[in-house]
Amino acid sequence: MASILRRGDSYSVRFKYKDHAGRICEGWESFKTKKEAQDRKISVEKELLDGTFLIPDAMTVAEMLYKWIPIQSSKHKWAPKTYTHTVAMIQNLVVPYLGKKQIQKVQTYDLEQFYATLSRTPRGLYKQGVKQTLTDKQKRQFLTGASIREVHAMLKTAFSYAVEWGLLLKSPIPREAPKSTSEERAIWDEKTMLAALQTMTDPTLHLAVHLSMILSLRVGEILGLQPGDINFDAADGRGTITVGRSLQRTEKAALEKTDPNQIYHIFPDQREGSSSALVLKKPKTKKSSRTLYLTKPLKEELLAWLEKLRQDELAMDGR
């Protein structure tokens, strides 16, 4: 039960509750009038009885996010790059502005103001949580709407966990995400593609660009291809190539925090003391694993490339 005490010109409601560790604590809330105190006495007794009382907690936004990220990463089996990117968002786009604020004091209005601040924030203002000195040109290059929407999506998920953990009764995240204007990427037409290929003299670069143009492969997917991924006899001799892995450079710290089953191989360091590693990993999503058809010119170039590799291996063995 709660009680009301008069303290000078104000009235205090005193009550007992159990914190997250099960310890019995005493709560005090002050009001200017006796009527306000009486109303709060009734409401807090009801909350304590039906389990809707919000246990006071001084956890900050930064503390909550750094508690949430390893749980989210493990639960959804994040790739190292996803982990690194999310940590960077927290360090550089959230903590400098909201990090010290207690989550129980965050209001929807605070977040709307936060998004407005981000829209006026130059890209790269913070790196690893440290404020950078920018040039005049860099100061005019602001965060994109897509970046702010990404921050919104992350906070929406993180604050939903805070509700599940009993730190909040409801999430303060605004219902509508910040607006984002998408910019269409300029894509080469067929004539430009052919002209580019015809001017390339480096065979490695030529094959990589040819694969990218015809099959729409990402750089990491091209670098992750192996001879066994190619079936020249499939599709009635047309030939296919199967995408099933990707080569990527990632921070070693992220590798320690993410699912090891996402990684096929970690390559040895080329430089001693490097903070990152080159890894061969599973594709970004299940849909990223796919089988694609070859064109005749691409098939011929792949055959020639593999034959050259075979000849090079024979030459090395003969030494």
Please tell me what each predicted stretch does.
Residues 7, 192, 225-307, 318:
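Conserved tyrosine-mediated DNA breakage-rejoining catalytic core shared by Y-recombinases
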Residues 66, 105-108, 120, 169, ...:
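Phosphate-coordinating loops and pocket residues in cytosolic domains that bind phosphorylated ligands
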Residues 127-129, 133-145, 149-151, 164-227, ...:
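Basic, Lys/Arg- and aromatic-enriched nucleic-acid-binding interface segment
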Residues 16-19, 113-136, 231-234, 244-257, ...:
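Short regulatory "switch" loops immediately downstream of catalytic or recognition motifs
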Residues 151-167, 184-187, 285-319:
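Extended amphipathic secondary-structure runs
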Residues 2-58, 285:
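Short, surface-exposed polybasic/aromatic micro-patch for ligand or macromolecular engagement
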Residues 57-163, 177:
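Short, Lys/Arg-enriched alpha-helical recognition elements, typified by the DNA-recognition helix
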Residues 123-127, 141, 198, 202-205, ...:
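Short, basic (Lys/Arg/His-rich) helix/loop patches that form interaction surfaces
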